Amino acid sequence: MSNTGASLKGLLLAVLLVSNMLLTKEGVTSLPICSSGSVNCQVSLGELFDRAVRLSHYIHFLSSEIFNEFDERYAQGRGFITKAVNGCHTSSLTTPEDKEQTQQIHHEELLNLILGVLRSWNDPLIHLASEVQRIKEAPDTILWKAVEIEEQNKRLLEGMEKIVGRIHSGDAGNEVFSQWDGLPSLQLADEDSRLFAFYNLLHCLRRDSHKIDNYLKVLKCRLIHDNNC
């Protein structure tokens, strides 16, 4: 086996081991999930929300970790933060900025908004997980977090589709999501420009994962606990 193949195999193994430990610690893996096509599934809406909230919190944790590590390793002294304001591909989606604004939105609209943001990240996360491997001397901790975030975003999206289907009696919503066209920026020959593209993407990921985490907590409180939390 080549060194590259062995390295990739080792990285994937590390992803599986570490993600299993972290998910178990967060309590995500302990929650029951209905398999696709299950009949008379007994998982309650509350349990589905529990799992979604824990999973979104885990994704935000990883997003913050990977951003902070990238910032410390590659962005110091480059002035990236001043250029990253309002540069997210999801900025076209109208999203509440704080808890007070979030509470003013009807739950159906908020659910569709969460679906829209999650689906807006499908494509960029796939390419982030592959392109980050091309960064010079990228540490394994950044590599496996990129792979893990992509996988867990898929799981959260699947969970949210179950929740929306339960609330809307099978309708997964007609949400609008933002297309991402940033792949060429992640492949630029100029190192500073390429690193800024990664920095900006990770900055936006941290921002959006935080929003989703907060939106889900508001929805859980409203729909499961009748705002008594």
From Swiss-Prot:
SUPFAM superfamilies with a match to the protein in the record: 4-helical cytokines
Secretion signal span: 1-30
Family: Belongs to the somatotropin/prolactin family.
Single Gene Ontology BP annotation: positive regulation of canonical NF-kappaB signal transduction
Molecular function via GO: cytokine activity; hormone activity
Record keywords: Disulfide bond, Glycoprotein, Hormone, Secreted, Signal
Record has Transferase as a keyword: no
Protein location: Secreted
Post-translational modification: Three forms are found, non-glycosylated, glycosylated and one form seems to be only O-glycosylated.
Protein name: Prolactin
Superkingdom assignment: Eukaryota
A GO-annotated cellular component: extracellular space
Disulphide bond pairs: C34-C41, C88-C204, C221-C229
